């Protein structure tokens, strides 16, 4: 019996089940799902807490290294950019829809009334919402797909932004009010892709390779090279999306402060013949983002009283523990607004535009 480690959520078990079915056919051997609790499953602790890097994957990897399971399946966007010694991503199956989507009681993003509460705990999504609809209130919500949809249905929030792949995999695609285009919200690096991981010396490695989809691997390699190149943490508002067609990889990436005001966006394309080319393209885009973004963000991040945001990495947002009010003209922002930001303790910041 092949033991496949998975998180316990419906989405995790569903996508792991897809891999398990395919692996069982290839190996002509039964596959058993082994549910493993991860630190990230504790929704009472913010994902941006210092102890949380790799919160959704560390326990799975520990079980793999200990020999408790033979293979694990991750949502690829949850993997830290640094490789894990002794482990390999043996397969990246065909990617599911990569976009972000809106679940809403009031139609599309443009239709939401001013002041509507939009739920997300993703800095990337919050920053994009702040850029394109600064009159909305972005509030942190966590939980599985059903939980977040439920918060919309009960009125706790008016809308929520989720990954399309998750809704499709659990059969909730009918809940989608709008597929948000990459011109508004560039997906997270590797969003919609799965990472099938095993030990480097595993006899299953060759079998798992048959599940690999080359265009998906090339795209994800470029996207994650952007992530590594900007040394992004889980709280960084970064997006990257690559598409591979007829030997050419097109890559779009963006980077923002948490308020969505300081903003950099880069588009590059290159002919690729292998993973090294894809990695090089991602590294080039990362350098271009940092080069383009630094002066723009420094100019945009002034406050109404003449002070500036905290020093350090210019692409990270405010980190103060007390309410702040700042006036932004906004790079690529559709509206002028007075911004109020509140961050309580280690929770994600909440932003509201005040006219």
Regions found by a protein language model. Give the residues of each.
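A conserved helix-loop-strand patch within extracytoplasmic ligand-binding domains
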Residues: 76-79, 85-136
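Residues embedded in well-ordered beta-strands
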Residues: 88, 101-103, 193-197, 252-254, ...
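Small-molecule-sensing regulatory modules
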Residues: 1-37, 43-50, 131-310
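N-terminal basic, low-complexity leaders that serve as flexible interaction/assembly modules and, when applicable
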Residues: 313-355
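Short, Asp-centered acidic motifs that coordinate Mg2+ and/or phosphate
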Residues: 69-73, 158-159
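Short, structured active-site "lid" loops
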Residues: 45-71
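Short, well-ordered beta-strand segments
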Residues: 3-5, 72, 90, 119, ...
């Amino acid at each position: 019996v092949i033991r496949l480690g998975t998180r316990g959520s419906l989405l995790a078990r569903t996508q792991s089940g897809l891999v398990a079915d395919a692996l069982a056919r290839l190996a002509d051997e039964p596959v058993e799902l082994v549910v493993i609790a991860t630190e990230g499953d504790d929704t009472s602790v913010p994902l941006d807490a210092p102890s949380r890097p790799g919160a959704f994957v560390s326990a799975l990897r520990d079980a793999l290294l200990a020999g408790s399971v033979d293979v694990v399946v991750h949502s690829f966007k949850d993997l830290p950019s640094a490789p894990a010694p002794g482990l390999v991503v043996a397969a990246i199956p065909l990617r599911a829809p990569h976009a972000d989507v809106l679940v809403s009681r009031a139609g599309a993003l443009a239709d939401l009334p001013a002041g509507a509460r939009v739920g997300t705990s993703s800095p990337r999504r919050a920053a994009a919402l702040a850029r394109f609809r600064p009159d909305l209130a972005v509030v942190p919500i966590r939980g599985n797909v059903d939980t977040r949809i439920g918060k919309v249905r009960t009125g706790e929030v008016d809308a929520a932004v989720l990954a399309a792949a998750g809704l499709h995999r659990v059969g909730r695609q009918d809940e989608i009010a709008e597929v948000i285009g990459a011109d508004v919200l560039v997906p997270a690096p590797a969003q919609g892709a799965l990472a099938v991981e095993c030990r480097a010396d595993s006899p299953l490695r060759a079998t798992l390779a048959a599940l690999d989809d080359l265009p998906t691997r090339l795209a994800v390699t470029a996207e994650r090279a952007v992530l590594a190149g900007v040394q992004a943490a889980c709280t960084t508002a970064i997006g990257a999306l690559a598409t591979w067609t007829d030997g050419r990889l097109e890559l779009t990436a963006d980077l923002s402060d948490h308020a969505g005001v300081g903003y950099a966006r880069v588009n590059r394309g290159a002919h690729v013949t292998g993973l090294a080319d894809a990695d090089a393209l991602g590294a080039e885009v990362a350098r271009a983002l940092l080069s383009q973004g630094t002066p723009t963000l420094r100019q945009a991040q002034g406050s109404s009283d003449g002070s500036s945001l905290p020093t350090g990495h210019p692409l990270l947002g405010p980190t103060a523990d007390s309410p702040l009010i700042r006036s932004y003209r906004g790079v690529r922002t559709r509206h002028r607004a007075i911004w109020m930001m509140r961050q309580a303790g280690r929770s994600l910041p909440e932003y509201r535009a005040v006219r």
